[in-house]
Amino acid sequence: QQVRRLEEMLGKPLFERSSHQVLLTEEGVKLLSYARRIIALNEEAHDALTGIWRDGVLRLGMPEDFAAPTTELLAEFSRAHPHLRLDVTSGLSADLHSAYAREELDLILVKQRRSQPPRAARPEPLLWLDSLAFPAIEQSPVPLAVFPLNGLYRDDLCQALDNLGKRWRIGYSSASLAALTAASAAGLGVTLLPASCRLPSHRVLGIAEGLPPIDSIELALYYRDGAPAATPALAERLKAFCGLV
């Protein structure tokens, strides 16, 4: 009866009724979407006003390749801090650094060439990688598998080929480390990635191909002094998980 009243008020049918079934009309689907959003906002307002998140919000940023491996660690941390809301963002390290500088994130795990001292870090050696079965380095122009603009390693990769006088093109671009790893192994492009990404189907390039050694980057952890009280505890868990010192 309430649904009938609502249909009369809107002047539109919300359900298609037959003797066998009742289905939402297009207007009914739209209204359902709005109703869900209203309920979600109501629950959010309730949580904010009743103090369920009385320990605040901890905003964590990390590279995409660490998002899945750390889910269990983050879930355990959340269970240990039920009144702290944990918001997690994954993305390119350069973007995470920028968000941290704008104070949009409290704690970040990033790959970088050091610009300021982190709370903890460890080196990440880099390798030139190509496909063992389908070498991209032998093509002209040489296809490259790279992160998007502002992504790590991209400038090093392009500059090295420029210095060799080799023509190159972007053959594969992705913000996903896993995707770049697979693409280079399949022959879609030469890439420069952490040594930990090397697969059995990769060929390691180097001096024989005229490619220079590249200084290691570092995996670094930062958090701000004014972050929620539980931030150092999460930082210690991430530090242990990633082998940072």
Model-predicted regions and their roles:
Residues R85-G91, R167-S176:
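Short beta-strand-to-loop elements that line the ligand-binding cleft
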Residues P69, G210-V245:
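A late-sequence structural motif
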Residues E72-E76, S93-D130, L205:
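Short beta-strand-centered segments that line the small-molecule binding cleft or hinge
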Residues R5-L24:
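A short LG(V/I)-centered, amphipathic sequence patch enriched
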Residues E7-L10, L31-I52:
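Alpha-helical linker/hinge and terminal dimerization helices associated
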Residues L49-F66, A80-L84, P141-V142:
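Interdomain hinge and pocket-entrance segments immediately C-terminal to HTH DNA-binding domains
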Residues A136, P143-G165, T231:
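Secondary-structure junction motif
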Residues P117-R119, A185-G226:
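Beta-alpha-beta core module
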